[in-house]
């Protein structure tokens, strides 16, 4: 769908409903909701938001776990001219309080489950914990918004320090949906299974890609990811495509995949963090006929930069850039120029100037492009470990460790060291019992002397960020209280 006039996301929703009509569109916890029910609710809630005083440009925080209420709330906010400000429901009151203080929202939307946390965090801000109370009989006409007006303020950076508000415009999100559709659409691919948190930029991308689908797509939505339930739903609903993050795929590999009929599953889209090549190979072997489409994006690029094209994946890469997106490598760092690049960081003009230079977004990720334009992610620039003057990328070490059959997941960090500057430390979870000393020896056999982890900590589970990434910050903190095996 091409834009004629301002790329207002509320207008996109209107046009999408007009084109598709009313049909069963969203399944959630045993109930199908129709597109008409969803669209009508968003119109009525938009009227309630306007009655509450929400005007063009106002931020509205949405702290609701996955449910049909989330896309309805987003569409209502856009219709009222507001700025969607998602908050992951796992935030503490202190974390949410910092977000609210920074965003200065007009309103917070939540559910009774989180009312206590929100009330503690949102002092002086009106809170509504039942979307139904906002529904009005009348429908609110779309409040005009232009391409460059803010559509979403998405907070990111939980693994890198203080969270930053990423300003995404209506044009950013419209084009992310369009480019994502153009890069990945397969005719007849209509049945999806979604477990991504809709408060994350990846989940927001999936919603916007869906609005550009030319047919009548149907989606099964999970409140949260649970591997056995995911497999049961994929089998029951004969899901054809499922977006996940790597930690979800690793958990699926621990399940008896062969016991489920996944014959209709054609594509698993994976992003948000690097995916180990060994995990890809194992999933492909155990689920014949599926294709894993690994992609790459940041919140700062509307969650999209590149993706492996259907039928032409190059495993180990994240594919070529999507349409209208340029990538260049500067001193090893991935830089992006695109209509997907954010307007900037909220209340952070200096950081914005540092991150976007001469129209190029400096991502902080290290990577390389091959001769065909496929992008490979090497690691996060800030996660680079320098041991004895040698650069060590954690992902290289993790990939080597994951070759051991007893290691289920791995995450590598650096800790300060008086002799070498930094020492390499690995945290692993196991699928079978083995001594940490044996794992250190295994790493030494496969990695250079400067590169193998001298310490390996066996843990029951890796700490994860709210969006399923291994939390390196938490692991570094663990090093101060937990001993390890050193050789």
Question: Where on the chain are the PLM-derived regions?
Answer:
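Conserved AMP-binding A3 loop
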Residues: 32-37, 151-178, 308
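Gly/Ser/Thr-rich phosphate-binding loop
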Residues: 239-244, 255-313, 326
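Conserved pre-ATP/AMP-binding loop-to-beta segment of ANL
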Residues: 6, 22, 138-155, 162, ...
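Conserved ATP/PPi-binding loop(s) of AMP-dependent carboxylate-activating enzymes
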Residues: 320-324, 331-355, 392
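AMP-binding/adenylate-forming catalytic core of the ANL superfamily
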Residues: 91, 242, 338, 343-344, ...
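Structural core segment of the AMP-binding/adenylate-forming
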Residues: 51-52, 79-137, 141-143, 430-432
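Conserved AMP-binding/adenylation subdomain of ANL enzymes
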Residues: 174-191, 199-240, 255
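Conserved AMP-binding/adenylate-forming core of the ANL superfamily
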Residues: 2-6, 14, 22-67, 71-75, ...
């Amino acid at each position: 769908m091409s834009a004629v006039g301002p790329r207002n996301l509320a207008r996109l929703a209107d046009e999408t409903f007009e084109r598709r009509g009313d049909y069963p569109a969203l399944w959630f916890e045993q109930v199908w909701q129709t597109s008409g029910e969803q669209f009508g609710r968003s119109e009525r809630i938009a009227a309630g938001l306007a009655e509450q005083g929400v005007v063009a440009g106002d931020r509205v925080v949405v702290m609701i776990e996955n449910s049909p209420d989330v896309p309805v709330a987003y569409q209502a906010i856009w219709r009222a001219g507001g700025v969607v400000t998602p908050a992951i429901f796992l935030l503490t009151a202190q974390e949410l309080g910092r977000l609210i203080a920074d965003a200065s929202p007009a309103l917070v939307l939540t559910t009774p489950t989180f009312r206590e946390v929100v009330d503690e965090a949102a002092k002086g801000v009106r809170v509504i914990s039942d979307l139904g109370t906002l529904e009005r009989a009348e429908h609110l006409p779309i409040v005009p918004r232009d391409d460059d007006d803010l559509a979403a303020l998405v907070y990111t950076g939980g693994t890198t320090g203080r969270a930053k508000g990423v300003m995404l415009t209506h044009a950013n999100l419209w084009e992310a949906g369009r480019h994502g559709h153009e890069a990945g659409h397969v005719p007849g691919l209509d049945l999806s299974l979604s477990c991504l948190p809709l408060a994350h930029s990846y989940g927001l991308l999936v919603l916007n890609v869906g609005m550009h689908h030319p047919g009548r797509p149907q989606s099964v939505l999970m409140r949260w990811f649970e591997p056995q339930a995911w497999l049961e739903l994929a089998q029951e609903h004969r899901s054809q495509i499922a977006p996940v993050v790597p930690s979800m795929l690793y958990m699926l590999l621990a399940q008896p995949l062969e016991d489920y009929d996944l014959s209709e599953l054609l594509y698993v889209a994976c992003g948000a963090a690097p995916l180990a090549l060994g995990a890809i190979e194992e999933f492909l072997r155990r689920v014949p006929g599926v294709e894993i489409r690994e992609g790459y994006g940041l919140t700062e690029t509307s969650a999209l930069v590149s993706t492996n094209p259907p039928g032409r994946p190059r495993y180990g890469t994240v594919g070529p850039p999507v349409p209208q997106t340029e990538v260049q490598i500067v001193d090893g760092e991935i830089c992006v120029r695109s209509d997907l690049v954010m307007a900037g960081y909220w209340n952070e003009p200096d950081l914005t100037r540092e991150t976007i230079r001469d129209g190029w977004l400096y991502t902080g990720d290290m990577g390389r492009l091959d001769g065909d334009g496929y992008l490979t992610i090497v690691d996060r620039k800030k996660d680079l470990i320098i041991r004895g003057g040698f650069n060590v990328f954690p992902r290289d070490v993790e990939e080597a460790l994951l070759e051991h059959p007893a290691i289920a997941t791995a995450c590598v960090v650096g800790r300060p060291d008086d002799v070498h500057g930094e020492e390499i430390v690995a945290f692993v979870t196991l699928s079978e019992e083995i001594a940490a000393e044996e794992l250190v020896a295994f790493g030494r056999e496969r990695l250079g002397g400067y590169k193998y982890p001298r310490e390996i900590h066996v843990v029951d589970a890796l700490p994860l960020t709210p969006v399923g990434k291994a939390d390196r910050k938490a692991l570094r903190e663990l090093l101060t209280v937990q001993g390890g095996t050193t050789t």
